[in-house]
Each structure stands twice: as C-alpha cells, then as structure tokens.
Amino acid sequence: RTSRKREGEVRRVDPNASRRFDRVYWQSVAWIGHRVAVALQYAHDQRVLHRDIKPSNLLVDSQGEVSVADFGLAKSIDQAGISRTGDVVGSLRYMAPEQLAGAADTRSDVYSLGVTLYELVTLHPAYNESERAKSLIHGNAILPVRPSQIRHDIPSDLETIILKSINIEPERRYQSAEELATDLRRFCEDRPILARRTSPVERLW
C-alpha cells in the first residue's frame, strides 16, 4: 500500500532521549515492522524490490495502519542485479552491502527494514554514515553495536530479530520478508521466535 499522506510518517526520535520503554512500545515497533514486512513480501511476490526502505518511507495513519511509500527506486527483481557497480541506488545509511555492488535481491529489502527497526528501538543510527560509506566502498565490513548495548531494556527476542535481519551475509539473514514478518508477529503475540540468538563471532562470518 502506498500513500502521499505524510503526517503520520515514522520519524527518527531524539537520540538523546533516555527514558525506558515498556512492552507496549517494543510490540508497537515490532508490529510496524511486521506490517512493512508483509507489504514487502507482497511486492516481492510481484517481482518488485523497493530498494529504499527507511523510516521516512513508512507511514502510519490515525487507525494505526502502516503503508510503505516512495517506490520511486523500485525495480524488477529480474533486473535488480544488473546495475553497474558504483551506481548507488537507495539511501546509504540503510543499504545492504550487496546493494552497493549492484547485487540487490529480496534480502536487501529485509536488511533495510532491519536497520530501520534498529533505529526505532535504539533511537540511534545503526551506522555513522561517512564511516559506513568508506567501509562499503573499500569492502570492509563494519557491524553496529548490539541494540541492548544502547537500550538495556530491549527484549532479547526483538534484538535477535533485528540482528538476524541486518547480518552482513545475505545467507544468514531472514531469507524472505515473510520469514521476518512471521518472527515479528510471534514476538507481538508473546510466542517464541524461530530465529536463534547469534554470538558476536557468528556475526562476523
């Protein structure tokens, strides 16, 4: 679903905020992620990649319905891998490493949604944009700190979902937006998630 209505736009919150969040907040973030993942799966089923998932492209109306906006950079899955290396398409801050190399696929959208969820739960950017630009250009992987190192009260299952979504190796991420949507829904329903928690060493490989 798309919309031009911007008043309900999901915005990044003050990174200096220090209040603790309750279970309702965490579940609200997870529910937003779930609805976006469902929308992405629909787009992927139509053979379309969004390629620019970020907070400003997620809209929430007065009824709590979530819409994915701005398909201006969307591309057919069948053509997404033929961009010339060096053609940066999307927002670097939310871009999967393989997307910069012109090798985007459905898991690249999963990655961008994961980075968006990271920022919504920590109220901090996942990456320093200038440092990340250098790392992507030179092929050096950098990892964001665990969300729980910034927000000590984040539920471990929600952190696990986010970290799996933003793994630098596409093969270690959720393999579809549907898989991500399933775990986010299970979290919202207080059911065990399917993803397992990864160690810091595993995140590097």
Model-predicted segments: where are they?
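Regulatory activation segment
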Residues: 66, 79-89
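Hydrophobic HxD+1 residue recognition
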Residues: 53
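Conserved short alpha-helix within the protein kinase catalytic core
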Residues: 19-37, 41
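Conserved catalytic-core element of eukaryotic-like protein kinases
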Residues: 49
